[in-house]
Every structure is written in structure tokens, then in C-alpha cells.
UniProtKB/Swiss-Prot annotation:
GO MF annotation: an example: protein kinase regulator activity
Acidic residues composition bias: residue spans: 229-259
Entry keyword annotation includes DNA repair: no
Chain segments carrying region Disordered: 226-285
Keywords: Phosphoprotein
Protein name in UniProt: Casein kinase II subunit beta-2
Compositional bias annotation for Low complexity: 260-272
A Pfam family matched in the record: CK_II_beta
Species in which this protein is naturally found: Neurospora crassa (strain ATCC 24698 / 74-OR23-1A / CBS 708.71 / DSM 1257 / FGSC 987)
GO cellular component, one term: protein kinase CK2 complex
PROSITE patterns: CK2_BETA
GO BP, sorted A to Z: regulation of transcription by RNA polymerase III
Length: 285
């Protein structure tokens, strides 16, 4: 509101939505089409959520003409922001709203993933709850599938309900090409170039579990989401190595069985010969 201190009240009312979108801390929001916000069907149930609902709606739609004191104006302004946020959560899951958020996502307006292995992948705002004043907004990375806190304190104060818990999932269903291929690359702790034993053992176990899961998915002909070329080649190499190891184990087992059978045969033959000699000795005596 400080941006409009020098402006007249009529100018302020005329540019409320423009002012709201351009205000510092509101970069995560997109501009809601006037046709959407003036359609009462899209606002169903919000009158019970917002104080001074009608005045707030009039302010958002630039028809506010109530002559009131500063305290009342500030209260209505706060209600208008809250109402805009609640409508925003509904708008961004529409075709037009998704398109606007897509444009902001391409420009990385929501920030980039701080995880090194994600290579500055764009983030997408999301809520952990659909209930207002419950949890602040978080940022979702589609590459590592994890969520992060906004860097700016202004953004961290935004209500997560203004984006909702379903938006980011709907977004990537509508734009499936934006879902990055899963990478098997991971950080391996080292000391002077050598892998840390405990961490290395954990990584080997995790890799074996992941590879086993991918083999099961491949047998079931289910898309795993991992890169195909190099990863499938790795799996094929692993399968070949396992087959070779199994063949070697079978050969060793067969050799052990044959050796055991030979030893048993030799022992039986030796026992027969010993018995014959003993019988011959008794006869001579």
C-alpha cells in the first residue's frame, strides 16, 4: 500500500489487482481474470470465509466506493488480500490459470531447487493444507520430489492455502513433458578420495533395492520414470553379471556334488577292499 501513498484514492482503487501482483512478496501469485472473479459461481462459499466479503470483492473488482476511515479501510484491504488468495487457489487449477502459472514456471519466478544434484531445477509453489491460516506456502521440486521453504521471509509468510495441496500435481498432469526423468546420480561421501565405509554400504544397499524394484517394474512392463538408455544398459549389465554369477555358482555346486560322489565311491571301494582283506586273513589263520 506504500506504493500508492502519493496516488489518489480513485487511482488506487482502479489499480488494486495490478498493485497486488506487483507488490514485493506477491511474486508467486498470477493475475486472476476479471471474468473469473466476477462470476459468483467461482466464489461459492467464500462469503463465510472472509470478513467484509462484499466490500473486499468490490475492492478487488475496482468498484469500491465506500467512504470510510483508515482503520476500516485497512481491515477491508486485509480481507481483500485474503479473498484474492482463496480465489487464486481455485483459479490456478483452471485451464487459463494453469497456463499463467506455466509461464511463470518457465521463467523460474518461483525460484530454483537448492539441491546441487537438481542443477537449479525450477520450483513450484504448493500448500501442505487447504485450510487457511494453517501452514505457509512451500516450494516443490519435480526432480528430487522434495519440498523446500522459500528463501524470502516475504514469501514464507504467504498462506499455503492460496495454492492448495493439489495444484502442483494437476500442473504436472496437464504438462507431463515438464516432469524430468529420474536420475540415478547421487552424492557419495569421501575422505581423501576414498568412500566412507558406512555411507558406501548404505548406498550399495539403496542401489540394490532400487535396481530390484526397476527389474520388477520392467518385468511387469510398468514405466519406471528413470532414464532409458544408460540406465537400462546398466540394468542389462547387472542382469548379465548376475546370470554369470548364478552359472558359476551352479557349476561350482555341480563340481562339489561330483567330487563328493567320487569321494563316497572311493570310500565305499576302500571299505569293500578292507573287508575282503580281513576275511582272507581269518581264513588263513
Amino acid at each position: 500500500m506504500d506504493d500508492f501513498v502519493s496516488e489518489s484514492e480513485s487511482d488506487y482503487a482502479s489499480y488494486w489487482r495490478d498493485w497486488f501482483i506487483s507488490s514485493r512478496g506477491n511474486e508467486y501469485f498470477c493475475e486472476i481474470d476479471e471474468d473469473y472473479i466476477t462470476d459468483r459461481f467461482n466464489l461459492t462459499g467464500l462469503n463465510t470465509e472472509v470478513q467484509y466479503y462484499q466490500y473486499a470483492l468490490d475492492l478487488i473488482t475496482d468498484v469500491f466506493d465506500l467512504d470510510c476511515d483508515d482503520d476500516m479501510r485497512e481491515t477491508i484491504e486485509k480481507s481483500a488480500r485474503h479473498l484474492y488468495g482463496l480465489v487464486h487457489a481455485r483459479y490456478i487449477v483452471t485451464t487459463r490459470g494453469l497456463q499463467k502459472m506455466f509461464e511463470k514456471y518457465k521463467k523460474a519466478d518461483f525460484g530454483k531447487c537448492p539441491r546441487v544434484m537438481c542443477s537449479s531445477h525450477p520450483l513450484l509453489p504448493m500448500g501442505l493444507s487447504d485450510v487457511p491460516n494453517s501452514k505457509p506456502v512451500k516450494l516443490y521440486c519435480a526432480r528430487c520430489e522434495d519440498i523446500y521453504n522459500p528463501k524470502s521471509s516475504r514469501h514464507a509468510a504467504i498462506d499455503g492455502a492460496y495454492f492448495g495441496t493439489s495444484f502442483h500435481n494437476i500442473f504436472f498432469q496437464v504438462y507431463p513433458t515438464l516432469v524430468p526423468a529420474k536420475s540415478v546420480e547421487r552424492y557419495i561421501p569421501r575422505c581423501y578420495g576414498f568412500k566412507v565405509h558406512a555411507a558406501a554400504a548404505l548406498v550399495r544397499w539403496q542401489n540394490s533395492q532400487r535396481d530390484e524394484m526397476r527389474r520388477r517394474l520392467r518385468k511387469l512392463e510398468v514405466e519406471s520414470g528413470f532414464k532409458d538408455a544408460e540406465d537400462e544398459a546398466e540394468l542389462d549389465d547387472d542382469d548379465e553379471e548376475e546370470e554369470e554369477e548364478e552359472e558359476e555358482e551352479e557349476e561350482l555346486a555341480a563340481m562339489d556334488e561330483a567330487e563328493g560322489a567320487q569321494q563316497q565311491h572311493a570310500a565305499a571301494a576302500a571299505g569293500t577292499a578292507t573287508g575282503g582283506v580281513a576275511a582272507g586273513g581269518e581264513g588263513v589263520h
